[in-house]
UniProtKB/Swiss-Prot annotation:
Substrate binds at residues 7-8, 96-98, 159. This is Isopentenyl-diphosphate delta-isomerase. The gene is fni. The lineage of its organism: Bacteria, Bacillati, Cyanobacteriota, Cyanophyceae, Synechococcales. The keyword Membrane does not apply. InterPro entries: Aldolase_TIM, FMN-dep_DH, IPdP_isomerase. It comes from Synechocystis sp. (strain ATCC 27184 / PCC 6803 / Kazusa). Keywords: Cytoplasm, Flavoprotein, FMN, Isomerase, Isoprene biosynthesis, Magnesium, Metal-binding, NADP. Involved in the biosynthesis of isoprenoids. Catalyzes the 1,3-allylic rearrangement of the homoallylic substrate isopentenyl (IPP) to its allylic isomer, dimethylallyl diphosphate (DMAPP). One of its GO terms (biological process) is isoprenoid biosynthetic process. Mg(2+) binds at residue 160. GO terms for molecular function: FMN binding; isopentenyl-diphosphate delta-isomerase activity; magnesium ion binding; NADPH binding; oxidoreductase activity. It is an enzyme of class 5 (isomerase). GO terms for cellular component: cytoplasm. Its EC number is 5.3.3.2. It catalyses: isopentenyl diphosphate = dimethylallyl diphosphate.
Length: 349
């Protein structure tokens, strides 16, 4: 049987050492361009991209997306990430806390409030675990464990399907999700892990009462590729590799979710490589922009390397807003987007 901590260590190693970006698929952001303003009416340093979300003030609309936990190595990574989130005024999600639910002695690998008392912090469990004995008690434990402001429930059907000993029982989850959302005292964020969320699924998630949807689209890390590198069976490895281009590109998924929902927060992650991608995502309707894998190697070294990485992305975001004559997030969300290939302006909801 594949232990959860061992799997977490494998994931870190593979993401760092192997090429696990989706093959033959991109985020779709490269097809989009923001309308440039040659004469901005705002000073660069006056651009203010701050917001308040669930009672927490953020300096920038950026999220350090969920990465890891459950091992001593993960503890240090999470501390570095949290220190940077605190210093820059951005949000952070922890990796799946299933390992610590199974073994409370591992809770320390997720606990970061000592270095990040003020950040918007998200707990994390797999939604499919609601079919394996998890419920309100385990969800509340995950939240309490890290003093979280909200709970991520991640969706990873493809990863589970190609993973050794993956969870195969997915029927009946809608009603369990709705019951948990109603009972839990903090907001629930439902996110994919790199294959995107469609418009119809987003609409049903809104009907369930979730607080936010993180599209986590295709074009970044492919978890079928990660699992292919873990497989020892030749046929299983081939099957996993063949799903490397599976999923909804992040930009496309984001458009679909925004168009099919109303008055729900939408986060954009999945292959976000620059602040320019982030600005495009906000112009498409995202409230927060998340990134993870590009900084993992830096997080293995020290907090300063992580800080430098995210500071650069945030500077890019600020410059992009400035060059669109957007003084704040509200104005950035209204900036026109154009399709490079067709030359057509995108229609926004």
């Amino acid at each position: 049987m594949d232990s959860t901590p061992h799997r977490k260590s494998d994931h870190i190693r593979i993401v760092l050492e192997e090429d696990v970006v989706g093959k033959g698929i991109s985020t779709g952001f490269e097809r989009l361009m923001l309308e440039h303003c040659a004469l901005p009416a705002v000073d660069l340093d006056a651009v203010d991209l701050g917001l308040t979300l669930w009672g927490k003030s953020l300096t920038y609309p950026w999220l350090i997306s969920s990465m890891t936990g459950g091992t001593p190595e993960a503890k240090q990574i999470n501390l570095f990430l949290a220190e940077v989130a605190q210093a820059l005024g951005i949000a952070m999600g922890l990796g799946s806390q299933r390992a610590a639910i199974e073994n409370p002695d591992l809770a320390f690998t997720y606990q970061v409030r000592s270095v990040a008392p003020d950040i918007l912090l998200f707990a994390n469990l797999g939604l499919v675990q609601l079919n394996y004995g998890y419920g309100l008690e385990q969800a509340q434990r995950a939240v309490d464990m890290i003093e979280a402001d909200a709970l991520i429930l991640h969706l990873n059907p493809l990863q589970e399907a190609v993973q050794p000993d993956g969870d195969r029982l997915w029927s009946g989850l809608w009603s369990k999700l709705e019951a948990l959302v109603e009972a839990l005292e903090v907001p629930v964020i439902v996110k994919e892990v790199g294959n995107g969320i469609s418009g119809p699924v987003a609409k049903r998630l809104q009907e369930c009462g979730v607080g936010a949807i993180d599209v986590a689209g295709a074009g970044g890390t492919s978890w079928s590729e990660v699992e292919a590198h873990r497989q020892t069976d030749r046929q299983a490895k081939e099957v996993a590799h063949n799903f490397a281009d599976w999923g909804l590109p992040t930009a496309w998924s984001l458009q679909q979710v925004v168009q099919n929902t109303e008055q729900i927060l939408v986060f954009a992650s999945g292959g976000i490589r620059s602040g320019i991608d982030g600005a495009k995502a906000i112009a498409l309707g995202a409230t927060l922009v998340g990134s993870a894998a590009p900084v993992l190697a830096e997080a293995k070294i020290n907090a300063q390397r992580v800080y430098d990485h995210y500071q650069a992305r945030l500077r890019e975001l600020q410059i992009a807003a400035f060059c669109c004559d957007a003084a704040n997030l509200t104005q950035l969300a209204q900036v026109p987007l154009w399709d490079r290939q067709s030359g057509q302006r995108l229609t926004k909801p």
